[in-house]
UniProtKB/Swiss-Prot annotation:
High-level lineage: Bacteria, Pseudomonadati, Chlamydiota, Chlamydiia, Chlamydiales
Repeat listed as a keyword: yes
Transmembrane intervals: none
Compositionally biased region (Basic residues): 66-81, 95-117
One Gene Ontology MF term: DNA binding
Name of the protein in its database record: Histone H1-like protein HC1
Family: Belongs to the histone H1/H5 family. HCT subfamily.
Function: Might have a role analogous to that of eukaryotic histone proteins.
Keyword DNA-binding in annotation: yes
Entry-linked Pfam families: Hc1 (PF07432)
Gene that produces this protein: hctA
InterPro entries, alphabetized: Hc1
Chain segments carrying region Disordered: 57-117
Domain of life according to the entry: Bacteria
Length: 117
């Protein structure tokens, strides 16, 4: 499927879900069932759209349009630089933990063991 076809299919499914959702809110049980099934279909189509859009973006089929001047001006006003005053935190002292020695596993062998050999 082409990216445009997938987008159109997504729009159609969304419109269908919206119509049926209105009916389901009024108590129509069949419409509620259609909403559930269509939402599953929409999920599958959305996955296909994601894959296609990534593929199109990498191959250069999708190009981003430059932002208009009004949008750029609004963005710069919002992102006005604020003075950053940060006090350097004192370096934290490392917590020293005592390592406990491993328990010795030196058991004395019994005399009977030596006798068996």
């Amino acid at each position: 499927m082409a990216l445009k076809d997938t987008a159109k299919k997504m729009r159609d499914l969304l419109e269908s879900i919206q119509r049926d959702l209105d009916k389901a809110e009024r108590g129509n049980k069949a419409a509620a069932q259609r909403v559930r099934t269509d939402s599953i279909k929409l999920e599958k189509v959305a996955k296909v759209y994601r894959k296609e859009s990534i593929k199109a973006e990498k191959s250069g089929l999708m190009t981003r349009k430059p932002a208009t001047k009004a949008k750029k001006a609004a963005a710069t006003k919002k992102a006005a630089p604020k003075p950053k005053i940060q006090a350097k935190a004192a370096p934290k002292a490392k917590a020293t933990t005592k390592k406990t020695p491993a328990k010795a596993k030196a058991k004395k062998s019994s005399k009977s063991r030596y006798l068996r050999k």
